[in-house]
Amino acid sequence: RGWIVALVAVVLVFALLALGMWSCTSAVSSSIGTLGALGSTATTSDVDYLTSDAVGVIDIDGTIQYDGTTCSPEGLKAQLDRAEQNPHIKAVVLRVNSGGGTATAGEEMAEYLREFSKPVVVSSASINASAAYMISSQADYIFTAKTTSIGAIGTVMQVTDLSGLMEKLGISVDNIASADSKDSSYGTRPLTEEERAYYQAMVDQINESFIETAA
């Protein structure tokens, strides 16, 4: 029953937000990566001493990548593990303000959220897109503002060709590789048709995984 009450409380908070009846200094505010109680704020150290039911707050603010913050798989998992292990944390609010990032990192984070046993509500800020949306799709509820940029399900890869610029600058590069396509992403020559097809197949495969995760 405890988690049901906590989830209802979270949903009510976001209903008030949607109606413009909750201030910017609402009870769910906290610093990046902290877990706080609904009706108060708490530091990460305070969480260990909670004595009543609470709602955890975790921020994903920035590029999804492997940097150790809550925008990374290892950082998010650490916070989710703390929330999972604390019996007083009945649900989690994931505050997302991210345009995406590394597909692999996003997929890992989505998996961690999918395995999390307690209710999760996503609060979207100005943007919740691409890899960030992949993560958010695993929550029980996603809330957005009318002006939130959300979704952007798709995959892109860039392979830069600097050979023309290097020629103008008089720069010559000799690539010594063990296979013909080993230097295809170095930017020192245009892609061959076979290499372009290889990278396109890779992008398509990643995108299929993205769609399956978000579905």
Task: Label every PLM stretch briefly.
Residues 1-119, 127-215:
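Small-residue-centered hinge/linker elements
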